[in-house]
């Protein structure tokens, strides 16, 4: 299936003439410029165009944690001028189709790494900064699937499915439901073609984030039906955490007991070796799930311990989408116990993190906090409520 060619470059502006030195020798103002280029808040200028396809490929090849600053340093080296010597992706594709087996293997590995990279970049960047590049990536996969030797078809179908699940998620974040549904169909076809039904588990898990209550729980339970009897432990841990979270939202006290199962699965898991989408799962994210469950159950003692663990796992300069969710949960807990000033502080932090990445997911998570603020008469709380509502309207998000 051809999905439509997207522009290769996202654009931005040049750095000021007198950069401020940073601790690693990279001008701090250059990093700021690149961040604004990638996120898309500056006007076009060819000198700071960022090749998102190549950025995703490089990030996908990294093994281990990548913080926001590392991502920006890589992007700083991939402006249009710096990436000019790299072959156009369509030229690489033509060579792959007509070249040797080694050429073909290299191209398949490049596409697999790039899919992983897009999943990793999603933690840090707004959906709008990635969507066109990801659809262009899917175009390459589509073309290669039509022409590649049979021995590569299953691998290409797997990575196409992994990419399509992310494209569906980004389309949902960008309020494009028809495109999101189309990518769901692509991922379903890829799961069937590759004989990797686990791809469907990811699709249904992503759907659960857009739902509430019983429908959200049912989406997670549908996802679990695609798990194998053994293995895929990172995905298993993620789905079990989501199930506990939604059970807690429904007031089911068994949710706290259910947290033991994902911990056991996580101990067996190898998130950086399993699936493109499992790279996000680490000890910090597991702590964030525990916090979310205990907040929903109103367990003040457990919230304190889980909150401290989640906060200690945070990289102060990274994963702002995760930050938005953690801060929102802590804010909700503080508002529940009547600590309004601390609650307001964390709501403000959550809102700032969600705005920074234009995260619909983060704003969705702030829905319960919005309801708690609505019952407050404190002037600061009322002002913050107004900011939340205006931000949600500006980004087109509905409250949870």
Name these PLM-found stretches.
Residues 1-91, 386-393:
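Short amphipathic recognition helices of helix-turn-helix/homeodomain-type DNA-binding modules
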Residues 94-400:
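Conserved binding/catalytic microenvironments
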